[in-house]
From Swiss-Prot:
PROSITE patterns attached to this UniProt entry: PNPLA
Role noted for this protein: Probable lipid hydrolase.
Major subcellular site: membrane
Cell compartment(s), UniProt: Membrane
Protein species of origin: Debaryomyces hansenii (strain ATCC 36239 / CBS 767 / BCRC 21394 / JCM 1990 / NBRC 0083 / IGC 2968) (Yeast)
Motif (GXSXG) on chain: 342-346
Annotated protein name in UniProt: Patatin-like phospholipase domain-containing protein DEHA2B04136g
Length: 788
C-alpha cells in the first residue's frame, strides 16, 4: 500500500541501459584485466599471417557477441586482444591492428599486477644509497611534525569557534541567525538576511561608496559617462566605453570582499554600475547608428574580455549528493551556468544536469531521486569477497548499468551538448601517474560515452578499479574502446577542480566551486569573512560603523595562517622528495596540494554523523536533507552570481542577435560600412584586422567544429582551434582565495589586491580617466590604454 501511494519519479520507469554497450565494456575490461601484452617481435609478420589472425579475431568476436557480460571472464582464454585506439598524444591517435602470437600472452595475477605497478612508478632517483637510508627516517619525522601542527591548528580553530559561539552569537543576534539558517527558500532567506543586516547596522555599510578593495572613483566616472552618452544618443562612443569597462574584475568590482560585509547586498554603487552596463548593452543592441559588423565585432570582443562562468562540482564520496542542492538553488533562480564540470561523485550530478533540460531537471531534483542512487546497495558479505578477489569494493559493470539513468543511456558529450546546450566536463586521470590528465568534454572527446567517463572519474584505488573509456564509432554505429594508452581513474587524485583546463577550452574566467571533500573542508577558514557570511563583529562596533575585523582577532588569525602554511610546506617537501610510498599504484601526495577553490567557493557544512554514511546510499529523507543543506549553502552566493551572470547574459543576447548564420559566412565588412565616431572615440576604436571575421569563435561555431561529419571531428583528432581568448596571457583565472584549501597558489594570491587594485584594474582606470579628460581634441589617446 505504501508503494502505490508514493510519489513517482520523473522517468523512473524508463530503462536506459543498452546491454550491447555494457557487453562491449565488459569485453574491454576483461581483456585488460586478465592478460598483458608483452613486447612484439621487431620483425613484421607476413601478409598471410596477418590475414589469418584477422580471420581468427573475427571468428572470436562473433562467438563473444553471443555471450552475456557476466560470462565473458571465462570465455576469453586463448583469444586475441581486441584492437584499441592508441595514441602518441591526446591529439594524435593511431588505430593499428597488431597480431600477437598466443605464446606471447600469459595469465596475469592480481599480486603481480600490483608489483608491476610499483615498478613502473619507481624511478632512478630512488636508487641512491642515501635515499634508501634516509627516506623513512625523514618521512617519519615530517609526519610527526605535521601531526603536531594539525593538533595546534585544531586548538586555534576551536578557540575561534568557542569565542564566537559564547561571546558574539548571543541574544537576539543568535535568534536572527538561527532564523536565517532555517529559511526554506531563497525569498525567505533574503528577508531574514536583510533583517539581520538591519539589526547589526550593516545596511549602512552599503551607502558609503568608498572601500579599499575596489576603485570607487573609476566606477563613479564610468557610470556618469555611460549615462550621459546613452541619454545623448551617442551610441558609437557608448560602444567604445563599454569595450573598456566590460571585462573581468573591472575596477575590482568582482572582489569577494564587496560581498563579504553583509549577509545580503553589496555597495549600492556596484549595483548601480551593473544596472547601467546592462542598460547600455541593450542600447547598443537596439541602436540603428551602429553597423551590423561593428556590433558583431563589439560583442565578440567584450565576450572575450569578460569570459564565461562555470560551475565546478568536487568529489567527496557520498558528501557529493549535497551538490544536488547547489544545482537546484541555481536552477530555481535561472542562474545555472552552461559550463559544468564534475569529478568523481560530482561528475554524476554534473552529468544529470547536462543531459536534462531545465524542466526535466526540476522534476528530478527531488528526494525521490534517492531510488535511483543504489551504487552502494551490496551488503558486506558480497563486497568483502569481491574486494579480496579483485582489489575493489564495487563492480564496474553494475556501476555502469546504474549510471545509465543519470546519463540518459549511452549519451555522448556531443549529444548532451546538442540536446541541452550545456557543456559537460568530466575530469579523469590515467592509471599511469606520468601520463597527462584529460578533461572529457564536447571538444576533447565528443563521441566518448558519458557513463564510461563517470566510472573512470570515480575509480578510486580500493573502491573501483581503473576502467577503459568507450566511444561511439560513427561509421559502424558500434561502441569501441577509447584508450589513449592506459586505463583511467578518479580525477580528484590530481585535478579535482580543473579551472585552467576550463579556461583553455571555454574561456572561463569566473568559477563557482562547490567543495565537499572532507579532508579539505577541515582547513576552510575565512579570516576576513566570505560571500554572504561576514565576520561576527560585536554590535557595539557596527553601530560605530567599524565593519572590518578578523575572525578571532589578529593573533588567532595569524596563528591559523602560520600553521596552515607550515603544513602545506612540509606536504610539498614530501611530494618534492618523493618520500610517500605509492600505495595501490598511486601517488597520493597530490590530494592535498591541488587548487580546491574558485572565484566563489561553497563549503556545505558536514556534521560528524555524516561520516558514517560516507559510502552508503541516501534514503529519501537523507537526500531531502542534503538538498536543503546545499540550497542554504548556495543562498548567500546567489546575489554575487546574479550580478556576474546578468552582464554575461546581456552579452550573450547581443551575440545571438548579431551572429552571422552559416549562409552568410562569406560576408566581410567594408570600409564603407564603418560608422562615424567622435575624434576621441576614433582613437580608441579597435582595428578590424584584430578580430577577423574568419577567426574561430568557440560560441558561434560549436555546431560546425563538433559536428560528427566535420573534418575536424574527434575521429580525425584534429587539434581544436582555441583562439577565442585562450591565448591571452591574462585569460587564466587567479582570484585571491586565501581562505580556502591548502594550495600554495591559493595562499600566494592574498586579498591585498584591493589596496593596489592590481595591474589589470589600474589599466582600466587609466583608460577611462584618460577618456574622460579628452574634452579637447588636443588630448592624445593611445590604443594601448584600451584593455582587451
Amino acid at each position: 500500500m505504501e508503494k502505490t501511494n508514493r510519489k513517482k519519479l520523473f522517468d523512473e520507469d524508463i530503462d536506459y541501459v543498452n546491454e550491447d554497450h555494457i557487453s562491449s565494456f565488459a569485453k574491454a575490461l576483461a581483456w585488460e584485466e586478465q592478460y598483458e601484452i608483452l613486447e612484439n617481435e621487431k620483425s613484421g609478420a607476413s601478409s598471410d599471417k596477418e590475414s589469418q589472425d584477422a580471420a581468427t579475431i573475427q571468428k572470436e568476436t562473433e562467438e563473444l557477441d553471443d555471450l552475456g557480460a557476466d560470462e565473458l571472464s571465462t570465455a576469453l582464454n586463448g583469444m586475441h586482444k581486441p584492437d584499441l585506439i592508441s595514441s602518441k598524444s591526446d591529439w594524435w591517435p593511431i588505430n593499428t591492428s597488431k597480431s600477437i602470437p598466443k605464446t606471447k600472452i600469459r595469465k596475469k595475477s592480481k599480486k603481480s599486477s600490483v608489483n608491476e605497478g610499483h615498478s613502473k612508478i619507481t624511478n632512478e632517483f630512488r636508487s641512491s644509497a642515501s635515499y634508501t637510508m634516509l627516506r623513512w627516517p625523514i618521512l617519519i619525522f615530517i609526519s610527526c611534525w605535521i601531526s603536531l601542527l594539525c593538533f595546534m591548528y585544531i586548538i586555534v580553530r576551536a578557540y575561534v569557534a568557542l569565542s564566537e559561539y559564547f561571546l558574539t552569537w548571543v541574544g537576539k543576534r543568535k535568534e536572527l541567525r538561527n532564523k536565517l539558517r532555517a529559511s526554506q527558500n531563497y525569498e525567505e532567506w533574503v528577508q531574514n538576511a536583510l533583517e539581520l543586516d538591519r539589526f547589526l547596522n550593516l545596511d549602512k555599510w552599503s551607502e558609503n561608496p568608498k572601500f579599499s578593495y575596489y576603485d570607487s572613483k573609476t566606477v563613479e566616472l564610468t557610470i556618469s559617462k555611460l549615462a550621459s552618452l546613452r541619454e545623448e544618443g551617442r551610441d558609437n562612443d557608448l560602444m567604445v566605453i563599454l569595450q573598456g569597462c566590460i571585462k573581468k574584475n573591472f575596477a575590482g568590482i568582482e572582489n569577494r570582499q564587496l560581498y563579504s560585509h553583509r549577509y545580503y547586498g553589496t555597495k549600492y554603487l556596484v549595483e548601480k554600475y551593473i544596472d547601467e552596463v546592462i542598460v547600455c548593452i541593450d542600447k547598443v543592441i537596439e541602436s540603428q547608428q551602429i553597423s551590423f559588423n561593428d556590433k558583431r565585432r563589439f560583442f565578440r570582443t567584450v565576450s572575450k574580455n569578460y569570459g564565461k562562468t562555470a560551475l565546478c562540482l568536487s568529489g567527496g564520496a557520498c558528501f557529493t549528493y549535497t551538490h544536488f542542492g547547489i544545482v537546484k538553488a541555481l536552477l530555481d533562480n535561472d542562474l545555472l551556468p552552461s559550463i559544468i564540470s564534475g569529478t568523481s561523485g560530482g561528475g554524476l550530478i554534473a552529468a544529470l544536469s547536462c543531459t536534462r533540460t531545465d524542466d526535466e531537471l526540476k522534476k528530478l531534483l527531488v528526494p525521490e531521486l534517492a531510488r535511483k542512487i543504489t551504487a552502494c546497495e551490496d551488503p558486506w558479505y558480497v563486497w568483502i569477497p569481491r574486494w579480496w578477489r579483485t582489489g575493489a569494493r564495487f563492480d564496474s559493470l553494475e556501476w555502469a548499468r546504474k549510471a545509465n539513468f543519470f546519463t540518459r543511456g549511452s549519451t555522448t558529450f556531443y549529444e548532451s551538448f546538442k540536446r541541452t546546450g550545456r557543456r559537460l566536463n568530466i575530469s579523469t586521470v590515467p592509471s599511469n601517474p606520468h601520463s597527462p590528465v584529460i578533461l572529457c568534454n564536447n571538444i576533447t572527446s565528443p563521441n566518448c560515452i558519458i557513463w564510461s567517463s563517470l566510472l573512470a572519474s570515480s575509480a578510486v584505488p580500493g573502491i573501483l578499479n581503473p576502467v577503459v573509456l568507450l566511444m561511439k564509432d560513427l561509421k559502424t554505429d558500434r561502441v569501441v574502446p577509447f584508450s589513449l594508452g592506459s586505463k583511467w581513474r578518479d580525477g580528484s587524485l590530481r585535478t579535482d577542480i580543473p579551472i585552467d583546463a576550463l579556461n583553455t577550452y571555454y574561456n572561463v574566467n569566473f568559477s563557482i566551486v562547490s567543495q565537499v571533500n572532507p579532508h579539505i573542508s577541515l582547513f576552510f577558514f575565512a579570516p576576513k569573512g566570505t560571500v554572504g557570511r561576514p565576520v561576527a563583529i560585536p554590535r557595539r562596533k557596527t553601530h560605530k560603523e567599524k565593519y572590518a575585523s578578523l575572525r578571532g582577532g589578529f593573533i588567532a588569525t595569524a596563528l591559523e595562517q602560520l600553521f596552515k602554511l607550515e603544513i602545506t610546506k612540509w606536504l610539498q617537501m614530501i611530494k618534492s622528495l618523493d618520500l610517500l610510498p605509492h600505495l595501490l599504484e598511486q601517488d597520493w601526495s597530490n590530494i592535498w596540494l591541488q587548487r580546491f577553490s574558485g572565484s566563489i567557493t561553497i563549503w556545505p557544512r558536514n556534521r560528524l554523523k555524516d561520516f558514517w554514511y560516507i559510502l552508503s546510499d541516501p534514503t529519501e529523507e537523507r537526500l531531502a536533507e542534503m538538498l536543503s543543506k546545499g540550497e542554504r549553502a548556495m543562498f548567500p552566493r546567489i546575489l554575487f552570481v546574479k550580478h556576474r551572470l546578468s552582464i554575461e547574459k546581456a552579452i550573450e543576447k547581443g551575440r545571438k542577435q548579431t551572429k552571422l548564420s552559416a549562409n552568410f559566412n562569406t560576408l566581410t565588412s567594408s570600409d564603407s560600412g564603418r560608422t562615424e565616431l567622435s575624434p576621441e572615440a576614433a582613437e580608441l576604436q579597435v582595428e578590424p584586422a584584430m578580430f577577423d571575421d574568419d577567426e574561430y569563435d568557440s560560441d558561434s561555431s560549436d555546431d560546425e567544429v563538433l559536428s560528427p561529419n566535420n573534418k575536424k571531428h574527434i575521429d580525425k583528432f584534429g587539434t581544436p582551434n582555441t583562439e577565442d581568448g585562450d591565448d591571452d596571457e591574462d585569460a587564466y583565472e587567479y582570484y585571491d582565495d586565501d581562505d580556502y584549501g591548502l594550495s600554495t597558489e591559493d595562499e600566494a594570491n592574498q586579498e591585498n589586491t584591493g589596496n593596489s587594485q592590481g595591474e589589470e584594474n589600474d589599466t582600466g582606470s587609466r583608460f577611462l580617466k584618460s577618456f574622460f579628460r579628452a574634452g579637447s581634441r588636443d588630448s592624445k589617446l593611445h590604443r594601448r590604454n584600451t584593455v582587451f
